[in-house]
Amino acid sequence: MAKHYECTISSRNDVPAHSDAMGIALSSMCAAPILRWGKQAMADCEAHRVTPELTEIIEAIIISTGYVSNFVQVDYTTGMAHAMYNGFTILPSTEEYHHLHGEVVSYGILVMLTADKQYAERDRLLAFNRSIGLPTHLADIHARPEDPPLRKRRWRASTSGSGPTPSPSKC
């Protein structure tokens, strides 16, 4: 799903080249099938059933994201959701609790949509995440604002002139 949201946000206000525009248009196929069939596909997968819904999800994850990655410039497919994942890899809890890339990125998408003030879309994804057990809070990925790496980064952000230290209660 991140390919769609990162791609559309990162390319906003640009006049994309033809290849980029194709990838941006195709990026909806990285999110729409997951939101439409994801819950059923998870149940089917857990029951070891190959169904059209599960096939749609597999194709969205493997084929659609592959096409988008190949069509658009790298700056369009790297954004806040993946930056958050990269940052969380330094937390011992990420490895200790075996949090998967997609779990952490799904939380990052929520944060990214909030930062972009896309509240209605964020709320739609929030409901989806809850429906299939994906993270919706820092605690769901066993991260705490007071964890030393997060505390250090909050301090750096607050001293860089970029604004006040984020409140832990807002995370």
What is each residue range found by the language model?
Residues 13-15, 43, 135-140:
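Charged, low-complexity surface segments at secondary-structure and domain boundaries
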Residues 118-171:
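C-terminal charged capping/lid subdomain of soluble metabolic enzymes
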